[in-house]
Amino acid sequence: MEIAGLSETVHVYAIERKPEAVELLRKNREHFHMDNMEIIEALAPEGLEELPVPTHAFIGGSGGRLMDILQTLYRKNPHMRIVINAISMETIAELQEVLEAFPVEDGEILQMQVNRVKKLGSYHLPQAENPVWICSFTFREGEKGSMDKVKKALLTEEENGNRENGEVQR
């Protein structure tokens, strides 16, 4: 929403799989008159396939499919800027793997912590909110073999998913 509100020349595609989140996006788009935002009710990366070539992507949730999403984005544009928010330990652990698996430049991972001050008697005490991790980088076309790292990371992710489902295949 924020990016769509910055300029009418920017076109935003919001891919969302949860029906209640799609409805909220629609209400906000109408309320804020965001005619430059298209909402796609789909699961990523499948929802990305038919979209125009992106220049930037913000990933606010991956449903456990971060590497698949990034591979699709890389295939569409190996020069795009990526920003990923992470709150779960599983995604946080994946962020360093992402920076190692894909050919990137200016990769950075940072963590933000927010506190709210609550009054307790005559004291004002900070109450910590959950931290948010932010990973940002720009894809670059990799030297020979860099996509092998991506494929290896995807295979490892698939094997891990199969183990969780009790479907270990050798």
Locate predicted features:
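Conserved SAM-binding loop of SAM-dependent methyltransferases across substrates and taxa
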Residues: M1-E8
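Short helix-capping segments at alpha-helix termini
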Residues: E8, E30-D35, A101-D106
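Short beta-strand element of Class I
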Residues: V10-Y13
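S-adenosyl-L-methionine
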Residues: I15-L51
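Catalytic, metal-anchored helix/loop core of enzyme active sites in primary metabolism
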Residues: V22, F32, E38, R65, ...
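Active-site segment flanking the S-adenosylmethionine/decSAM binding pocket
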Residues: I40-R81
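C-terminal substrate-binding/active-site "lid" region of AdoMet-derived donor-dependent transferases
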Residues: R75, H79-A128
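Core SAM-dependent methyltransferase catalytic element
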Residues: Y123-L155
